[in-house]
Amino acid sequence: MTFLKRVKEYVGDAFRAAKYIGQGMGVVFDHMGRRPVTVQYPFEKLIPSERFRGRIHFEFDKCIACEICVRVCPIDLPVVDWAYNPELKKKELYSYSIDFGVCIFCANCVEFCPTNCLSVTEDYELATYDRHDLNYHQVAMGRLPSKVTEDPMVTPLREFAYLPKGVIDPHDLPAGSQRAGKRPEEILAEMRAAKAAKEAEAKAAKAAAE
């Protein structure tokens, strides 16, 4: 009886082992047909999506020190240093800073800013060796980042950032797959074509009137 029990356990263990090996090989075979997804950073970079919220850009001259950004921030992050100027009868901004080591990039400050002095950029390269370097003041926040598409030293990887509508897996896509919506260069081309057509219509109308 003990012998038969041991044989039964052995056969059961063998079937379980075969099942687990089959599951593992299924994962292996599934990945064998996929395209490589390794990004050779920093020589290859992803193009951020249309609504990507990266580093916040700040324009010092537009800020009126209303501190709305501080009130709408979930963690009261922006530090606004100002003083009232009795001669001008308004606030005078001295400094403005945001610690991106704490920021959650919700962009509430951008949405509620009455003067549009804050805006989100496509800059996501904020890594540093010292967390104190992530505390950006108005000068650092005033710098505009360079675009990935305009950097000759970088290969922009469009296919991993822009997928067709309804597709969430970047693998096994046809070579000519396009993302949902239009790319920036396509939008610019349409705007230029519309402008040229409008100018042509205006010239034709002017010529007809003469």
From Swiss-Prot:
What's the record's note on cofactor binding?
Answer: Binds 2 [4Fe-4S] clusters per subunit.
Q: How does it sit in the membrane?
A: Peripheral membrane protein
Q: What Pfam families does the record tag this protein with?
A: Fer4_7
UniProt keyword annotation of Membrane present = yes
Q: Name one GO cellular component term.
A: plasma membrane-derived thylakoid membrane
> What residues does [4Fe-4S] cluster 2 bind to?
C73, C103, C106, C109
What this protein is reported to do is described as:
NDH-1 shuttles electrons from an unknown electron donor, via FMN and iron-sulfur (Fe-S) centers, to quinones in the respiratory and/or the photosynthetic chain. The immediate electron acceptor for the enzyme in this species is believed to be plastoquinone. Couples the redox reaction to proton translocation, and thus conserves the redox energy in a proton gradient.
Recorded hits in HAMAP family, A to Z, give:
NDH1_NuoI
Q: What family does the entry list?
A: Belongs to the complex I 23 kDa subunit family.
Task: From the Swiss-Prot or TrEMBL record, give the protein name.
Answer: NAD(P)H-quinone oxidoreductase subunit I
